[in-house]
UniProtKB/Swiss-Prot annotation:
All ranges on the Periplasmic side of the membrane: 72-77, 134-141, 196-199, 244-298, 364-374
Protein name: Probable peptidoglycan glycosyltransferase FtsW
Family classification: Belongs to the SEDS family. FtsW subfamily.
Main location class: membrane
Catalysed reactions, as listed in the record: [GlcNAc-(1->4)-Mur2Ac(oyl-L-Ala-gamma-D-Glu-L-Lys-D-Ala-D-Ala)](n)-di-trans,octa-cis-undecaprenyl diphosphate + beta-D-GlcNAc-(1->4)-Mur2Ac(oyl-L-Ala-gamma-D-Glu-L-Lys-D-Ala-D-Ala)-di-trans,octa-cis-undecaprenyl diphosphate = [GlcNAc-(1->4)-Mur2Ac(oyl-L-Ala-gamma-D-Glu-L-Lys-D-Ala-D-Ala)](n+1)-di-trans,octa-cis-undecaprenyl diphosphate + di-trans,octa-cis-undecaprenyl diphosphate + H(+)
Organism: Xanthomonas oryzae pv. oryzae (strain KACC10331 / KXO85)
Native organism taxonomy: Bacteria, Pseudomonadati, Pseudomonadota, Gammaproteobacteria, Lysobacterales
Length: 486
């Protein structure tokens, strides 16, 4: 209504609408709106500096700790460091690509990304393509290296689920059928993961799905019921699989079988204990000298604790808290701006990083059973490094587009005043100087002929709400339950 009132005032300024408006005035109007559209297109955004700083600091710390923890594992002291740097370079390239790609383009391919999840999880079982390590079929053999497919699945699935919640957020809030569709999809993905087997990543995907459904509008009560139904099956998977049961028993008391099932955890705890307050010094770890298995991947946190001490551990946890906190803040900001796809992606990536880092640190501290989950951005591992960097690039793109929309909102609002997030701005047409306004014709005192209907002005110009909402649907929709949670 406000936009229509401004348009009518603008037309009155030019001497009426339709036949009463001269051609040169209409041309001036079109030229002015064209210039305004050009100015709006030139508006850019900026990437979140806190998010970027936390990611770069964690990745830099990862380079140092991979070099320190793997120096005695191969004949060449920098074998794993060189590989890590190569994969990190590839990850940075993927991150730059994601930072330069519009989110609407990514959303348009959400179905293809979901299909890629299933294809990747099936390919590992194809003879000649899949690679088996320690009895697990989790990798694709690329010749020069192996690629762990679940790392791609995490990113692709979060993007698909974010798109689904945008397209069906009313239905997810109101019906069982819409809520159970992503549950069915993640159930199929988890089934394929358990065949590899990969119990840790399965639980991670289930947890991220449950949290994103709640944030997307599903009632918490409806989420709890499927969880209660799945819980006995998950417990049975642990009890009836001997190696999983050994992990649980060794986690409860690793010192009972210190040289057997509790070997990894007991050495990890000894490394953490040696670190004390300030650590033994960078590069001076003893446990990494072929005592602690996987010291450069799953148990790199123990080496950090030994070399940098309690102070270094607090710094690492603080960096993860900053990264995840900024992701959640960004998600909340996007949802308030009606940019739901961007917001759900930010929430999903933040949940993934938070849960995986918590599990990895918890395993090293002995508060959780051993899982094969790396420490994001720090641990060595080509697949993890590549896909985590890609996720960071997508997250930074979310921050860029949110900032750009905020600047656009300021430009469109009168006198630069901010418009509330719940009221999308309408385009404001700059007034043409009065020198161009022709004199009005005197009106006759006749009540016969009604005024001609006003011709539509610049119908091809998209409303600002379409730009500010990003890739969300344009029609009014019920807001998700996240507003009630917040």
């Amino acid at each position: 209504m406000a936009g229509a009132a401004r348009d009518r005032a603008f037309l009155d300024h030019f001497g009426g609408a339709g036949a009463d408006r001269p051609c040169h005035v209409e041309g001036a109007l079109m030229n002015d709106m064209s210039r305004q559209a050009t100015r709006l297109d030139a508006i850019g955004g900026r990437y979140d500096p806190w998010l970027l700083g936390a990611a770069v600091t964690l990745a830099s710390l990862g380079v140092v700790m991979v070099a320190s923890s793997s120096i005695e594992l191969e004949a060449s002291p920098f074998y794993y460091l060189t590989r890590h740097l190569l994969f990190l370079g590839g990850g940075i390239a993927l991150a730059f690509w994601a930072m330069r790609t519009e989110l609407k383009t990514i959303e348009q391919h959400n179905q293809m990304l979901l299909l890629a999840c299933f294809v990747l999880l099936v390919v590992v079982f194809v003879p000649g393509l899949g690679s088996t390590v320690n009895g697990a079929k989790r990798w694709i053999n690329l010749g020069v290296s192996r690629f762990q497919v679940v790392e791609s699945v995490k990113v692709f699935y979060i993007i698909w689920l974010a798109s689904y919640l945008v397209r069906f957020r009313d239905e997810v809030n109101a019906t069982w059928q819409a809520m159970l569709k992503p549950v069915f999809v993640v159930g199929l993905l988890v089934g394929l993961l358990l065949l590899q087997p990969d119990f840790g990543s399965s639980m991670l995907l289930l947890s991220v799905t449950a949290c994103m459904l709640v944030l997307g509008g599903a009632p918490i009560g409806r989420i709890i019921l499927p969880i209660l139904l799945l819980l006995p099956a998950l417990v049975a998977l642990v009890i009836f699989e001997p190696y999983r049961m050994r992990r649980v028993t060794s986690f409860m008391d690793p010192w009972v079988d210190q040289l057997g099932s509790g070997y990894q955890l007991s050495n990890a705890l000894m490394a953490i204990g040696r670190g004390q307050w300030t650590g033994v010094g960078l590069g001076a770890s003893v446990q990494k000298l072929n005592y602690l298995p996987e010291s450069h991947t799953d148990f790199i946190f123990s080496v950090i604790a030994e070399e940098l001490g309690f102070v270094g551990v607090c710094g690492v946890i603080g960096l993860y808290a900053l990264l995840v906190g900024r992701a959640f803040w960004l998600g909340m900001r996007c949802v308030e701006m009606k940019r739901h796809f961007s917001g759900y992606i930010a929430f999903g990536i933040g949940l993934w990083i938070a849960m995986q880092s918590f599990v990895s640190i918890g395993v090293n501290l002995g508060i959780l059973p051993t899982k094969g989950l790396t420490l994001p951005l720090i641990s060595s591992g080509g697949s993890s490094v590549l896909m985590t960097c890609l996720a960071m690039g997508v997250l930074l793109r979310v921050s860029y587009e949110a900032d750009r929309a905020e600047r656009l909102r300021s430009k469109l609002s009168p006198q630069g005043a901010a418009i509330s997030p719940g009221e999308p701005a309408e385009p404001v047409v700059d007034a043409v100087p009065p020198a161009y306004a022709p004199a009005r014709k005197p009106q006759r005192d006749t009540a016969a002929a009604p005024a001609p209907a006003a011709a539509p002005v610049a119908a091809h110009v998209a409303p600002a709400s379409a730009i500010l909402r990003g890739t969300s649907r344009m029609q009014p929709r019920v807001e998700p339950t996240f507003g009630r949670i917040a």
